[in-house]
């Protein structure tokens, strides 16, 4: 049976986990042949929940921020996190403690190696393990400006291959997505843009 997530499988600023259960209640009022269009898709959580609750419905997820690409790289991200975890544990750095000196330098050297040889780093996930309070950075130079902490999780992220199963994924400006489906019968727009208080630095 397909697993239903009530929070996004990878870190994301402004994910909708706080009202996931209330959202499920609201979905019950819509028929099974509804076309749901998630205009500001973010982590895809609302699209995922909608498809789990309404498996026969059409669900369109506007992945403007490239979350699907992050999901596809989970195995690579887990491998990098495992290396970082081993480095921190070998040095005996306690949880939530600051990472300084030679270990900090070695961590950045490992990140630079990954970027050079692997060609991809999920900076949001990696920085969530090395920084505090959702202080996500999107490049190594930006990370170097910040203090590092041992906030690395002890286990791998689940690969969640079925998270977006059965969902139509697009990546467009929300106005374009709205115009594309506005004349379709039984369409319902899921409209939840980033809050004014949300740090939009990680959004496209």
PLM regions and their residue ranges:
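S-adenosyl-L-methionine
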Residues: 1-35, 45, 125, 129
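Short, well-ordered alpha-helical scaffold segments within catalytic/effector domains
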Residues: 16-24, 154, 171, 175
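Short, well-ordered alpha-helical microsegments
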Residues: 20, 43-47, 177-179
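A general structural motif
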Residues: 31-34, 56, 184-186
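Conserved proline-anchored active-site loop of SAM-dependent methyltransferases
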Residues: 37-50, 61-65, 129-131, 183-199
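Class I S-adenosyl-L-methionine-dependent methyltransferase module
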Residues: 58-164
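Conserved mid-sequence domains
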Residues: 164-204
